[in-house]
Amino acid sequence: MRNDYLCAINQTTMTAFDFFNIIRSIPKTLRFNLHYFPLKTALKLPVVVSHRTYLRELHGKVELPEKVETAMVKIGFGDVGHYDRKRSRGIWQVSGTVSFGGKASIGHGSKISVRGNLCLSDGFNMTAESTIVCAKEIRFGRDCLLSWDILVMDTDEHPIYRHETNRHETRDSGSVPSPEVLRPASNDMENERINPDKAILVGDHVWVGCKCVLLKGTQVPNNTVVAAGTLLASAFSGEHQVIGGNPPTVLKHDIRWEH
């Protein structure tokens, strides 16, 4: 099992630094696998966890495909040159469900916070220092690549409720409204939330550039590139395109991209 673990986690030439970090990752890797999976599955070590990943909340559940391989999911590894991976710390905070559809890599310094349903299909790769906050549902299709310093969040975290006031009287008077004017129109309106969580759906073979923000309600179709620094909060259609700008629009059509 030890040799399988070392070979699977590094298919390239291993430096002394890499080897040392892999050995240090064994305790957290064992803890993660034994917590989430049956013993037979856990002993295959399908998920490897860097010692620099803070396992803040090991609740909820983690789902794997039927065919399980050693180190098919890597959390907290990689080496993006403009970050210091020696001090780059990730966080795993899960009380919901995380589903891995195959091989996946969550790079060093990345934060995963899930109380809803997060689905990462085969070939998912998040390079470094990015954050996923899932309160409802976030889905990534096959072969998705996320660059560094990205935020994916399907919630506003804090609820906002409707508060009806007599705006007509306030505008006309030009004075500070009295408490009677500001009172809600009804208890039903007072309890109506106006910012519910909304799912984020990302298709197959999507590349999200660095410093992008994907907020609730985002839908990205297959074979799309999201340009660096773009903020998305709505649904797009079409394929083989580049989306970018603020507000975002389709910048180019009929493109394809490769890793």
Language-model-derived ranges and their functions:
Residues V225:
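Cys/His-clustered metal-coordination modules, chiefly Zn-binding fingers
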Residues R2-M153, P159, E169-L182, S186-N187, ...:
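Domain-scale signature associated with acetyltransferase and cell-envelope carbohydrate enzymes
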Residues L232-A233:
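Short hydrophobic beta-strand element within catalytic cores of glycosyltransferases
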